[in-house]
């Protein structure tokens, strides 16, 4: 039986795993500094796995942790929860050098918007897209 999160399988690509673990392009320039998704070290990814309830992690490359997290989230029907965790503002420690909190919030929102655009570009041929609506992430048919 297909689950509500089966559409997230379209994200099962190494390119997306690497992007989500912080090995992607800078997405926003603010006052001459460039920002993207947080860069997660292996130990941080391991901690994220534990926090999310995934206790048996094989490890290896950093992208493998993200792959296992996504597989687990799809299996457990918790993809929205996973993406809210990965995109939580508290994860963006790379923004801590911005002094003004309003600017931090603005840069954070811009990064999330650009990150979704980046992911959607990567999956565009599937005719599906990642959207963030009313505080929740979901995969929908393009234009719906």
Regions found by a protein language model. Give the residues of each.
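Charged interaction/catalytic cores of defense and host-pathogen modules
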Residues: 1-139
């Amino acid at each position: 039986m297909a689950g509500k999160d089966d559409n997230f399988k379209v994200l099962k690509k190494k390119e997306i795993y690497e992007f989500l673990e912080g090995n992607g392009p800078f997405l926003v320039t603010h006052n001459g500094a460039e920002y993207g998704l947080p860069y997660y070290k292996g130990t941080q990814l391991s901690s994220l796995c534990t926090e999310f309830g995934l206790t048996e992690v094989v490890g290896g490359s950093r992208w493998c942790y993200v792959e296992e997290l996504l597989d687990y989230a799809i299996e457990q029907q918790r993809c929205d929860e996973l993406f809210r965790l990965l995109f939580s503002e508290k994860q963006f420690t790379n923004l801590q050098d911005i002094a003004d909190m309003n600017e931090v919030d603005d840069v954070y929102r811009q990064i999330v918007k650009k990150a979704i655009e980046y992911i959607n570009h990567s999956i565009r041929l599937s005719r599906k897209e990642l959207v963030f609506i009313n505080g929740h992430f979901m995969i929908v048919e393009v234009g719906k």
